[in-house]
C-alpha cells in the first residue's frame, strides 16, 4: 500500500484554540487506580505472555482523535521489518491444557534460584539509614503465580519474555503514564525499553536513512550524537537560551533550508531533552514547549522527547540565606507543579517520549519505556523482538515488586517528591559553593531549574594567552589544570551537536548528582582554585568574589 499523500498529514500550525486535557482533571486519584483495573486471568501473566498497553489504561480515550500516520517519515528498514515469528507463537501458551513442544523456553526447575528477598524503604522513611533501620523485606518466590501468591514470580520473570516487557510491569507503567501525561489522542501506547540510549538507537533506525540531518539543541547529550554518527547521520544544533531550544531559530533554519548547500534533505526529526537538559541544565517552559511543537507542526517534524530528568524539577534558587524550600503539600500540587511534557500537548501523535527509571530509581536496572502512537509503538516492538528482546526479567521483577506490589502509585509519588527535594538541596549546595569560591570575573552561570547538571561559562578571552592560544587549547589547559587540583568537570566541547561548526563560547559541565554535599563544596573550591591559577587571578578561595 502506498503511503498517505502529503495532504493527509498536513499540519495544523496553530494549536492555541485546542483544549488539551489536564492529566489531573482527566484522571482518577492515584490511590484509586488499582480499583479501576480490569479483571484478568493467569494466562495474562504467564511466561512470555504477549500484552498490549491499551488493555491497562484505566480511562476510555475513545472520545479523543486518532494520531496521524507517519509512513512518510518511517525508514525502509522499519517498514519491511516483520517481527519475531517465534515470539508471536507465545500467544497460544495461555490455552488451558496445552502441552508446549514449541518454543525453546527452559523449564524453571533448572533455574538455580528459589527466592529473592529485597529490603526496601517504607513510605516517609526513604533515606538510606532509615531503610537500614526500618525498611521491610519483600519476597519473590519461584512459583508464586502457580500458588496464587502473586502474579509475578521467578519462574516467569527469569524466562524469555516479549520485547515489550512483562505484562505485570507494563500495566503499572501505562497507568503511571496516563496519570502524569494523559496524551490527548486516543491510540497511544507504551512499550518497555532497556533505557533511553537504546530507545534512541532504535528510533533513529525507524525514522532516518544515511545522510540525514537531525535537529537538536546546539549543546546536546554527547551519546546521542555518538549514537547517530555510525548510522551516517549528522546533527544540526539549534541556538539556545536559559529555557533551552529557541523555536524561532529552528523555524528559520527549516524555512531557509537549502538542500544543495546543506548536502541533505530537509530534516524531519527533532531530538530534544526538554527538562534539565544535558549538559546545560536548561528547562523549557510550558509556553516554550508549545512554541516548539507549533514549529514542528508547521514543518512536519517528528519529535523524540528524551526526558529522564522530568521529575527532578525544582523551585527557583533564591540565594544562601533564603528560607528552606518546602516540599509540595499533596500529590496534586506536585503534579501540577511539573511543566507539561511534549507528550501531554501532542494532539497529532508526533512525539515519541522516552522515559527511564535511571535517574529516579536505578540506572543499572536498564528499564525504561517509550510512549507513542500505536503505529510507532508497533514498529518499535517488532524491532525489540529481534534485538534487545526487552529488559532483563530479574530487573523487571524487582521493580514490579517495589512499585506495584509494595509502593503503588501513591508511594511512588511520595518517593518522587523525596527525590526532588534531595536534588534541590544538592543544587543549592553547588550554587552556594559557586558563589563562594568561583572568580566571577571569568566564570558565570544560571541556576538550573531541573536535572543534575550545572553549566559554567568561562570568559576565555580574558585568559592571559588569548588570542595566541585557541579556544580549544585554553579549554584543554583549564580541564587538565582542574584535574591537577583534584577535581573533574566535563568539557563543554564534548557536547557540541556539530563539531564541524566554529564556536565562540567556552563551557564546562559540573554535576551535583554523585558526590556527597561536603565533597561537592570541596570540588567547587578546587575548581575555583584551578581557574584562578590558569587565569593568573589573585585572591584566595574562601572569599566571595564581587
Question: Which residues make up each language-model segment?
Answer:
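Preference for well-ordered, secondary-structure-rich cores of eukaryotic proteins
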Residues: 105, 109-113, 225-238, 244-255, ...
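Conserved core segment of the aminotransferase class I/II
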Residues: 6-52, 64, 340-421
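Short, solvent-exposed loop/turn segments at secondary-structure junctions
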Residues: 104-108, 197, 220-222, 243, ...
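Conserved core of the PLP fold type I
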Residues: 39, 125-300, 304, 310-345, ...
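N-terminal "arm"/small-domain region of PLP-dependent enzymes with the aminotransferase-like
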Residues: 2-165, 175, 483-488
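PLP-dependent enzyme catalytic core of the Aspartate aminotransferase-like
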Residues: 113, 485, 497-546
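Conserved glycine-rich beta-strand-loop-beta hairpin in the small C-terminal domain of fold type I
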Residues: 416-431, 442-461
Amino acid at each position: 500500500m502506498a503511503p498517505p499523500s502529503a495532504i493527509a498529514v498536513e499540519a495544523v500550525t496553530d494549536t492555541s484554540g485546542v483544549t488539551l486535557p489536564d492529566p489531573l482533571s482527566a484522571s482518577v486519584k492515584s490511590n484509586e487506580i488499582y480499583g479501576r483495573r480490569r479483571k484478568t486471568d493467569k494466562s495474562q501473566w504467564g511466561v512470555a505472555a504477549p500484552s498490549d498497553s491499551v488493555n491497562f489504561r484505566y480511562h476510555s480515550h475513545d472520545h479523543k482523535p486518532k494520531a496521524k500516520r507517519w509512513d512518510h517519515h518511517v525508514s525502509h528498514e522499519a517498514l519491511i521489518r516483520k517481527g519475531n515469528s517465534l515470539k508471536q507463537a507465545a500467544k497460544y501458551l495461555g490455552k488451558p491444557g496445552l502441552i508446549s513442544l514449541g518454543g525453546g523456553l527452559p523449564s524453571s526447575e533448572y533455574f538455580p534460584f528459589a527466592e529473592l528477598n529485597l529490603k526496601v524503604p517504607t513510605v516517609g522513611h526513604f533515606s538510606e539509614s532509615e531503610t537500614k533501620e526500618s525498611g521491610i523485606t519483600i519476597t519473590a518466590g519461584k512459583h508464586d503465580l502457580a500458588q496464587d501468591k502473586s502474579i509475578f514470580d521467578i519462574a516467569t520473570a527469569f524466562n524469555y519474555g516479549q520485547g515489550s516487557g512483562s505484562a505485570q510491569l507494563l500495566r503499572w507503567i501505562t497507568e503511571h503514564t496516563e496519570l502524569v501525561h494523559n496524551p490527548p489522542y486516543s491510540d497511544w501506547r507504551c512499550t518497555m525499553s532497556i533505557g533511553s540510549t537504546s530507545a534512541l538507537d532504535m528510533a533513529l533506525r525507524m525514522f532516518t536513512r544515511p545522510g540525514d540531518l537531525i535537529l537538536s539543541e546546539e549543546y546536546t547529550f554527547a551519546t546521542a550524537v555518538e549514537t547517530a554518527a555510525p548510522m551516517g547521520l549528522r546533527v544540526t544544533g539549534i541556538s539556545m537560551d536559559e529555557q533551552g531550544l529557541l523555536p524561532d531559530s529552528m523555524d528559520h533554519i527549516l524555512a531557509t533550508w537549502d538542500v544543495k548547500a546543506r548536502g541533505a534533505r530537509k530534516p524531519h526529526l527533532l531530538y530534544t531533552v526538554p527538562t534539565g537538559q544535558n549538559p546545560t541544565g536548561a528547562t523549557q517552559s510550558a509556553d516554550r514547549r508549545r512554541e516548539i511543537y507549533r514549529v514542528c507542526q508547521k514543518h512536519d517534524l517528528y519529535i523524540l522527547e528524551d526526558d529522564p530528568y522530568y521529575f527532578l524539577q525544582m523551585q527557583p534558587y533564591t540565594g544562601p540565606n533564603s528560607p528552606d524550600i518546602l516540599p509540595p503539600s499533596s500529590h496534586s500540587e506536585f503534579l501540577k507543579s511539573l511543566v507539561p511534557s511534549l507528550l501531554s500537548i501532542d494532539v497529532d501523535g508526533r512525539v515519541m517520549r522516552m522515559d527511564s527509571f535511571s535517574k529516579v530509581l536505578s540506572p543499572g536496572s536498564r528499564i525504561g519505556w517509550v510512549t507513542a502512537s500505536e503505529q510507532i509503538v508497533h514498529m518499535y516492538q517488532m524491532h525489540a523482538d529481534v534485538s534487545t528482546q526487552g529488559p532483563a526479567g530479574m530487573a523487571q521483577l524487582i521493580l514490579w515488586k517495589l512499585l506495584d506490589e509494595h509502593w503503588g502509585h501513591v508511594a511512588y509519588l511520595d518517593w518522587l517528591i523525596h527525590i526532588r527535594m534531595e536534588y534541590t538541596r544538592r543544587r543549592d549546595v553547588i550554587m552556594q559553593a559557586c558563589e563562594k569560591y568561583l572568580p566571577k570575573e571569568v566564570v558565570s552561570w544560571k541556576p538550573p531549574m531541573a536535572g543534575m547538571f550545572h553549566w559554567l561559562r568561562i570568559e576565555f578571552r580574558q585568559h592571559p594567552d588569548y588570542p595566541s592560544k585557541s579556544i580549544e587549547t585554553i579549554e584543554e589547559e583549564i580541564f587538565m589544570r582542574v584535574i591537577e587540583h583534584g577535581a573533574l568537570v566535563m568539557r563543554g566541547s564534548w557536547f557540541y551537536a556539530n563539531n564541524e561548526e566554529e564556536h565562540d563560547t567556552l563551557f564546562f559541565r559540573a554535576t551535583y548528582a554523585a558526590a556527597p554535599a561536603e565533597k561537592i563544596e570541596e570540588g567547587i573550591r578546587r575548581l575555583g582554585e584551578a581557574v584562578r591559577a590558569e587565569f593568573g587571578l589573585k585572591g584566595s578561595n574562601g572569599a566571595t568574589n564581587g
